[in-house]
């Protein structure tokens, strides 16, 4: 007797790996609720800055500096600002690691499941092009609709006294390396992934982007009004980052795009001195 061979249907070649995975299944390892994720991100954002501020203030306390001396050191010292940034990013990742461990999860569930591939830098560059074009168009439209919008308002990124190789290197790490990694893991990996588990892509992306952009509203000089131009900028950036996270299932392309964006700002502000 001869056995009947089962007919094997070939997989369609025009499908990408992520097309074979439903969005809900991409984020099935995230067992906590979207509401819990939003609350945790907001608390973590505030708490890490408080903890970093306390820790960085230990050095002036040992030096027996006055409040004015401490404030001057924190505002003008590149080393102090670098140390503060390192503490904030470390506390953020540490807090997120604690949360994931309590829920029997890990960073792989947030999109860190493989090494970057050659396609990722291309997606990053393409994403930057999309972000830049949309940003220019939207700013033109918003300037026409809202004439009072201050498109020239500057964001205070710190490190104003950075000169020389060592100081510029610390500034580069603080602005171009650390925030893209930490913010993508927290915002697009954790927050967007948590929201996407229950919500459609557009709703999850808009909510994530609104929360992310709100953190940049108060980034101006002390006493300056809210930075609505920075809100628009980072909101558009986040939408593109969420799209990359959705389509690739991972964070590498988004991290690359975020680094390109911050890298352009670094070159403009600290090397070309364009304000």
Predicted regions and their residues:
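Generic preference for well-ordered secondary structure
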Residues: 22-23, 31, 70-74, 94-96, ...
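Cytoplasmic juxtamembrane regions at transmembrane-helix boundaries
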Residues: 102-122, 190-208
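Alpha-helical transmembrane segments of multi-pass membrane proteins
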Residues: 36, 40, 115-131, 179, ...
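Transmembrane helix-loop-helix hairpins at the membrane interface
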Residues: 46, 132-136, 140, 144-145, ...
